[in-house]
């Protein structure tokens, strides 16, 4: 499916920049980062949040002629309350959970748009990232993840993956059956 190459998760935020405040790296900052990664031989990048930052990253790759491709995923937020999350005990109302699900739907739509407009750079799309663990802050029901996988496959024609820790995959067979690639996080210590 893909030629072998070095891969890295890319997030080029500088001090005072954050997706939470909608302050993103500039074109020149992204170019600086990708020039370094290109010199180090990285061919594949993984990013989340289908926003201007991802589009700008695609533009830099294209403008500079870097031999790089991007796996882009949505920045999903929780659609269920998770009392098992040790650092976020927020108890969202039904209305808030509905709004969060609508935001995730918009994120998937935006991901499809960006993947199609940058099909020369984006080689695969992800349903999400760590959205099922018992300790997770941004959990999404498996049925919704499956529907996202189907929408992404139909909407982009790109290989579809989901990024999750090694221990969660034993509970994700239904989702795995919908995917083209299984992306496993294997932390050395946790």
Predicted regions and their residues:
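Aromatic- and acid-rich polysaccharide-binding/catalytic face
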Residues: 72-74, 83, 123, 129, ...
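Catalytic domains of carbohydrate-active enzymes, especially glycoside hydrolases
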Residues: 28-53
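Hydrophobic faces of well-ordered beta-strands that scaffold small-molecule active sites
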Residues: 4-10, 45-47, 68-74, 123-127, ...
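Substrate-binding cleft of extracellular glycoside hydrolase catalytic domains
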Residues: 57-158
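A structural motif
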Residues: 39-42, 122, 157, 179
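Boundary/entry segment of secreted carbohydrate-active catalytic domains
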Residues: 1-33
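Acidic-and-aromatic substrate-binding clefts and catalytic sites of carbohydrate-active enzymes
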Residues: 44-56, 77-81, 101-104, 133-134, ...
């Amino acid at each position: 499916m893909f030629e072998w190459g070095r891969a890295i998760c890319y997030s080029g935020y500088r001090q005072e920049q954050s997706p939470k405040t909608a302050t993103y790296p500039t074109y020149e900052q992204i170019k600086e980062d990708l020039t370094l990664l290109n010199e180090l031989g990285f061919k594949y990048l993984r990013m989340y949040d289908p926003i201007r930052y991802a589009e700008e990253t695609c533009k830099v790759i294209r403008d500079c002629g870097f031999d790089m491709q991007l796996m882009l995923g949505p920045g999903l937020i929780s659609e269920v309350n998770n009392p098992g999350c040790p650092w976020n005990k927020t108890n969202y109302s039904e209305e808030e959970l509905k709004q969060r699900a609508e935001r995730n739907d918009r994120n998937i739509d935006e991901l499809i748009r960006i993947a199609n407009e940058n099909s020369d750079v984006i080689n695969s799309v992800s349903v999400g990232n760590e959205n099922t663990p018992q300790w997770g802050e941004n959990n999404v029901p498996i049925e919704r993840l499956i529907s996202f996988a189907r929408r992404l496959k139909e909407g982009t024609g790109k290989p579809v993956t989901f990024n999750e820790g090694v221990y969660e995959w034993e509970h994700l067979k239904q989702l795995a059956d919908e995917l083209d690639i299984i992306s496993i996080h294997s932390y050395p210590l946790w």
